């Protein structure tokens, strides 16, 4: 988080936090309530977000759920939705921390290679994450949607 980074940097230089670092921490702390509110809305609506995003993805990419597609059949469709749920969870971690580090460290590193080795079209997974962003936007205020959207966009960008 911003707090941890500022402290680690200051300590490495054996100094107190600078006025700029303190201002960034103040802004981070002040935004904490909204970040928690956003994460709570996403968490409470996770099943709805994942299901609607999956429906949008499968409608846009019927090849994924057609015979021979990576999400063909009930079990594989459930696996696809499980993956979307995983990325939604990572997004909430990023929102709460106010930083993309948890997204990077927990589960985005190597994702392209993993899906490529499985023969999964990464653009479809990224499309599912983008669809979750759109569904989430319907549950949040414009300001909260913008905050959350940057984390969804980060995940999508990491997949491209």
Swiss-Prot record:
Keyword Transport applies: yes
PTM comment, free text: Contains one covalently linked phycocyanobilin chromophore.
Gene Ontology cellular-component terms for this entry are:
phycobilisome; plasma membrane-derived thylakoid membrane
| Residues modified as N4-methylasparagine | 70
Q: Which UniProt keywords apply?
A: Antenna complex, Bile pigment, Chromophore, Electron transport, Membrane, Methylation, Photosynthesis, Phycobilisome, Thylakoid, Transport
- Where would you find this protein in the cell? Cellular thylakoid membrane
Function noted in UniProt:
Light-harvesting photosynthetic bile pigment-protein from the phycobiliprotein complex. Allophycocyanin has a maximum absorption at approximately 650 nanometers.
Q: How does it assemble?
A: Component of the phycobilisome. Heterodimer of an alpha and a beta chain.
Which family is this sequence assigned to?
A: Belongs to the phycobiliprotein family.
What's this protein's name?
Allophycocyanin alpha chain
Q: Its encoding gene is what?
A: apcA
